Amino acid sequence: MRLTPNYDYEVSSINKKKRGYIVQIIGPVLDVAFSPGMMPSIYNALVVQGRHNQEPNVTCEVQQLLGNNRVRAVAMSDTDGLMRGMEVIDTGTPISVPVGGSTLGRIFNVLGEPVDQLGPVETNQLSPIHRSAPPFLKLDTRLSIFETGIKVVDLLAPYRRGGKVGLFGGAGVGKTVLIMELINNIAKAYGGVSVFGGVGERTREGNDLYMEMKESGVINQQKLDESKVALVYGQMNEPPGARMRVGLTALTMAEYFRDVNRQDVLLFIDNIFRFVQAGSEVSALLGRMPSAVGYQPTLSTEMGSLQERITSTKEGSITSIQAVYVPADDLTDPAPATTFAHLDATTVLSRSLAAKGIYPAVDPLDSTSMMLQPQIVGEQHYKTAQRVKQTLQRYKELQDIIAILGLDELSDDDRLTVARARKIERFLSQPFFVAEIFTGSPGKYVSLAETIRGCTLILSGEFDDLPEQAFYLVGTIDEVNAKAMLEEEKNFTK
């Protein structure tokens, strides 16, 4: 029988707990002996009691029951200073983390402890990180578009409400800015919130993201309850147990906003490959036989237990955007291959577009979405998207000829195609709200209907007489005329 999750999760007093002692320590793995009949359950949190009545200092999670009243647990923090014989307390529950509005604007570790030096989190609501996926009867199976207000995404690779999106992009192509704009737009358009799970990435990147979020207003440090995001970090310097579970901590916080607050939630996981990598390390430490390419034999199960909890229910939705690192650019590697099976859309960021100064640098030809079907998005959206892709594809094919022979050697039709493709390419750029402080241009949220209308007018030749620069970094197509007239006036006054 599936139990309804309880968010007022009470962690009982530590003195009433079952007690054991450490018998073996191998790196981040502890073997703990308990009295007969006092064994903890799988996934229970164990706390190593410090010597001389000090505070408990290391939390572990039970992974295996070994027999002879012993369990094997994986530590969530460094095991430096632990010794055989130290007392271990079974908390009687899985790792439980704070949930609710008080988590917004704060940074947490895998245990739900704030690490931003802003004091304790004021909440009594805790939730265990291990839960079942929502039952089928509670799922919302309607296929609906999750409008982001970002033109290139909504038109060519739309996100599914409650779906999963893979975000592919190297360093310096605008991944962080795109993530922050999505966080900002979901808060404005849907009254939703976001949870960011930093899984096994660099500490410096996590710090930079936090600073940029404060600068752009996504995190309001004066009024934390007005912040739009909660951050959960398990960086690459932390033990594999923490990196393996930090994604579940972030997901648990997101589930509360969906199930209790009935909100639409954006869940960012950066990087989903590191989740698999940490699971592989833990699997080896526990002595399991490795599977293909050295990965854990439970790879599909672990990925499924995380991904199946990310879904839409009748209360709200969790839409997940997951950065995917592809080792050695090998898409057949078991880690990315297992991830792809769960994705509804892919957003690919292009370095060549970023080099041209076109932001967001989303590649319109490489980005894909299962939602781009006429029976889901409608005939007009589908046909416009296909015509845009065909025009951009033809432009891509002609680029080599243009580079060698020049534009004058093309036929009239091809010259017209190139001109319209360059205008579409620039029209799909957009000023972001979170980049206002850097660019000085006010951000634009563009509805899907306006994006379709704009691209249709460009393709039909309505704007063939306007310079392509007028299409750069505008919101709706109506702004193009105004920008062109302004440029004309400037040139005239010169």
From Swiss-Prot:
One of its GO terms (cellular component) is mitochondrion. It catalyses: ATP + H2O + 4 H(+)(in) = ADP + phosphate + 5 H(+)(out). Its main location: plastid. F-type ATPases have 2 components, CF(1) - the catalytic core - and CF(0) - the membrane proton channel. CF(1) has five subunits: alpha(3), beta(3), gamma(1), delta(1), epsilon(1). CF(0) has four main subunits: a(1), b(1), b'(1) and c(9-12). The gene is atpB. ATP binds at G169, G170, A171, G172, V173, G174, K175, T176. It is a peripheral membrane protein. This is ATP synthase subunit beta, plastid. PANTHER family: ATP SYNTHASE, ATP SYNTHASE SUBUNIT BETA, MITOCHONDRIAL. GO terms for molecular function: ATP binding; ATP hydrolysis activity; proton-transporting ATP synthase activity, rotational mechanism. CDD domains: ATP-synt_F1_beta_C (cd18110), ATP-synt_F1_beta_N (cd18115), F1-ATPase_beta_CD (cd01133). Keywords: ATP synthesis, ATP-binding, CF(1), Hydrogen ion transport, Ion transport, Membrane, Nucleotide-binding, Plastid, Thylakoid, Translocase, Transport.
